[in-house]
Amino acid sequence: MSSWSFIFSVVVSAQGLVMNGYLVGLLVVAAVVALFLMYVIGLYNNLVALKNRFQNAFSQIDVQLKRRYDLIPNLVETAKGYMSHEKETLEAVIQARNTAMAAGQRAASNPGDPSAISNLSTAEVALAGSLNRFIGLAEAYPDLKANQNMLALQEELSSTENKIAFARQAFNDAVMHYNTACETFPGNLVAGFGNFQKGALWELNDTAQREPVQVKF
C-alpha cells in the first residue's frame, strides 16, 4: 500500500469516527429532550387530574346543597299552618334560601373562582342563621314539633347538613392538594405556563360560620 493510500484510509476512518460520534451526540440530546418533555407532560397531566378532582369534589357539595334547598320550602310550607304569626321569619328563610341557591349555582359553574366561593360561604352563613331562628321559634309550637311530616323533614335536613360538612372538608382537602402542586417546584413552572389558577377554599373564618344548623325540635 502506498503512503497516499494509507493516509486516505486514515482520513476516511477519522471522518467515520467523527460522524459516528456526532450521531451518538444527537441521539443523546434527543433522548434527554424526549425525557424532559415526557416529564413536563406528566406534571401537566397531574395538575389537570388534581384540578378535575377538586371540581368533582365541589359537585358533591352541590348535590347536597340542592337537596337542602329542596327541603327548605317543604319545611316552611309545613310550618305555615302552625306559625301564622311568624310570617316575617318564614319569608326570611325562603329569601335566604333563594340567595344561597343562586350563589351555589354560580360557584358550581366555576368552583375555582374565589369570589364565587366567598359569596356562597356568605350566603350559606345567612341561610344557616335564618334556619336556626326558624327552628328556635318552632320549638314554641308543640303541635308542629309533633307533626310527623315535620319530624321526617327534620331528620332529612339533619342528615343533609352532616353530608354538606363532610363534602366541604373533602373539597377543601382536594383544593389544598391542587394548590400545593401549583405552588411547589417544578409544578409552579408548569402551572404558570399552562395558566393553572389556584383553587379557592371554602373557608369558615369565624365562630358563626362554624356553627352548623341545629336541627332539633
Report each predicted region and the residues it spans.
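A helix-centric hydrophobic-segment signal that preferentially recognizes long
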Residues: 4-217
